Amino acid sequence: MTLTFPAPSKDKAELETGPAFTPRFDEKGLVTAVVTDARDGELLMVAHMNAEALALTIETGIAHYYSRSRNSLWKKGESSGNTQAVQEIRTDCDQDAIWLKVTVAGHDATCHTGRRSCFYRTVGVENGKARVTITDEHRHFDPAQIYAEKKG
């Protein structure tokens, strides 16, 4: 079974309070997905989903995304083993963003750098220039080793 999504209602009240899930995909056919840890609420990543990725996520309970750089569907954790089991899916008021609450398998890391979250740096100003500072040095796995094993 593959879910399909009806076109969003033009009636704002229906879109915001009605029972129909009608995601508002952008002009490229994507919707933004915000992903947090279901256990502690930590922000893990922000990604994009097309209709197929969203349908697979709902149907399988495992997070799937659409890679804009590769222009392809991607099952999160397929290479690293850090799959995301979806505990809850929410949508925002106008259904143009998705919030996934997940538990991460494997090394409990979401970022391809080996870190738990893709948000491991803070942004600030130093000598009048915007700079980033790494605030999470801990890597749950060695990306060179994990991704080399999958390629080999």
Swiss-Prot record:
Chain positions recorded as Mg(2+) binding sites: D92, D94, D96
Cofactor binding summary note: Binds 1 Mg(2+) ion per subunit.
Binding site for Zn(2+): C93, C111, C118
GO molecular function: magnesium ion binding; phosphoribosyl-AMP cyclohydrolase activity; zinc ion binding
Compartments, as annotated in UniProt: Cytoplasm
Catalytic activity line of the entry: 1-(5-phospho-beta-D-ribosyl)-5'-AMP + H2O = 1-(5-phospho-beta-D-ribosyl)-5-[(5-phospho-beta-D-ribosylamino)methylideneamino]imidazole-4-carboxamide
Highest taxon of source: Bacteria
Gene Ontology terms: biological process: L-histidine biosynthetic process
EC numbers for this chain: 3.5.4.19
Keyword set, alphabetical order: Amino-acid biosynthesis, Cytoplasm, Histidine biosynthesis, Hydrolase, Magnesium, Metal-binding, Zinc
Cofactor dependency: Mg(2+); Zn(2+)
Pathway annotation from the record: Amino-acid biosynthesis; L-histidine biosynthesis; L-histidine from 5-phospho-alpha-D-ribose 1-diphosphate: step 3/9
GO terms under cellular component: cytoplasm
UniProt KW Hydrolase keyword: yes
Family: Belongs to the PRA-CH family.
Matching NCBIfam families: PRK00051.1
PANTHER family listed in its UniProt record: HISTIDINE BIOSYNTHESIS BIFUNCTIONAL PROTEIN, HISTIDINE BIOSYNTHESIS BIFUNCTIONAL PROTEIN HIS7
Function per UniProt: Catalyzes the hydrolysis of the adenine ring of phosphoribosyl-AMP.
Subunit structure: Homodimer.
Protein name: Phosphoribosyl-AMP cyclohydrolase
